[in-house]
């Protein structure tokens, strides 16, 4: 099965359409309160055609609620989200011609086959049913088109959800946890597909708690925790300075003084430091420095490490 799946990934079509009509997505001050609980406390970001933005953070951070507000499924307490200046509900014609979305891989009728599922959704999307076989081929499910969805793995349901989002041939994709349940080959396929979708002019917003798995998928990062945006960045800028590490010292001043005495470049970052050297070099330099209780002192430079420096979340909450 694994060999067959790898062959499907290797022969994946390079693009569903040669050109996309992506839109500028603007999220401005989105807030959602349930009584005294602030599920989302003011999220702002913009992303345009040719870009993939990752809304990243632990489970329960407010990512799904933010996406639902963008799509008009949850009414915000305040704020708005627009696609080229138009809210989702006011998009002309079939909204799925403009924006394709996946919000859950658990909403399939289990006795329907994959083809029957897309057949049922085609009229909703205003889509030609001739696209169904094309999309099943695209997401690697052509050989499983007649299998009941109830027999699908989580990864297969994720791919069927993506095919559903693509029915209307949209220029924008809004994907909630699309990497969840995918094996390494599926992650590789998704990364290639989203990159090609964006390169063809599409716009992508995806959410994930799997920071390491999606790090190579995104151009722009919005880290969210407990309903609040804690950091935004472009990935190109993040890795433009070469190798780096994250340090979580109990005494940041002590760590900074030690690094400075050895000529190691560093900068403050959240409750820790971003150090421009490999972890082994940094660990050797900081042998006498104690870590924040319950945390390692030196971490490999990646998004998950930065998140830990910005918050008091433990690593197990991100995986």
Model-derived features with residue positions:
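ABC transporter nucleotide-binding domain
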Residues: 190-277
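Residues that scaffold the ATP/ADP-binding catalytic core of kinase and kinase-like folds
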Residues: 91, 238, 306
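Intrinsically disordered, low-complexity regions enriched in polar/acidic and amide residues
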Residues: 1, 6-9, 13, 130, ...
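ABC transporter nucleotide-binding domains
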Residues: 22-25, 32-212, 216-225, 231
């Amino acid at each position: 099965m694994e060999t067959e799946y790898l062959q499907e990934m290797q022969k994946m079509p390079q693009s569903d359409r040669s050109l996309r009509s992506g839109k500028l997505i603007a999220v401005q001050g989105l807030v959602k309160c349930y009584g005294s609980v602030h599920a989302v406390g003011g999220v702002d970001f913009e992303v345009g055609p040719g870009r993939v933005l990752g809304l990243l953070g632990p489970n329960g951070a407010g990512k799904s609620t933010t996406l639902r507000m963008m799509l008009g499924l949850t009414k915000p307490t305040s704020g708005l989200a627009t696609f080229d200046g138009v809210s989702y509900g006011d998009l002309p014609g079939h909204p799925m011609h403009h924006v394709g979305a996946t919000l859950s891989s658990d909403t399939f009728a289990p006795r329907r086959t994959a083809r029957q599922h897309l057949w049922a959704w085609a009229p909703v999307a205003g889509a030609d049913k001739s696209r169904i076989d094309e999309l099943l081929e695209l997401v690697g499910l052509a050989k499983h088109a007649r299998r009941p969805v109830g027999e699908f793995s989580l990864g297969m349901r994720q791919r069927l959800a993506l095919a559903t989002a693509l029915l209307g041939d949209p220029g924008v994709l809004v994907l909630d946890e699309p990497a969840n349940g995918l094996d390494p080959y599926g992650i590789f396929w998704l990364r290639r597909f989203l990159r090609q979708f964006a390169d063809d002019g599409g716009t992508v917003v995806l959410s994930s708690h799997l920071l390491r798995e999606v790090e190579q998928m995104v151009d722009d990062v919005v880290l969210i925790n407990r309903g609040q945006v804690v950091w935004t960045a472009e990935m190109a800028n993040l890795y433009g300075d070469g190798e780096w590490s994250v340090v979580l010292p109990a005494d940041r001043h002590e760590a900074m003084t030690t690094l400075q005495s050895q000529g190691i470049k560093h900068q403050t970052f959240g409750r820790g430091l971003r150090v421009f050297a490999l972890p082994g070099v940094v660990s050797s330099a900081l042998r006498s420095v104690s870590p924040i209780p319950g945390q390692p002192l030196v971490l490999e430079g990646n998004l998950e490490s930065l998140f830990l420096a910005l918050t008091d979340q433990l690593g197990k909450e991100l995986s």
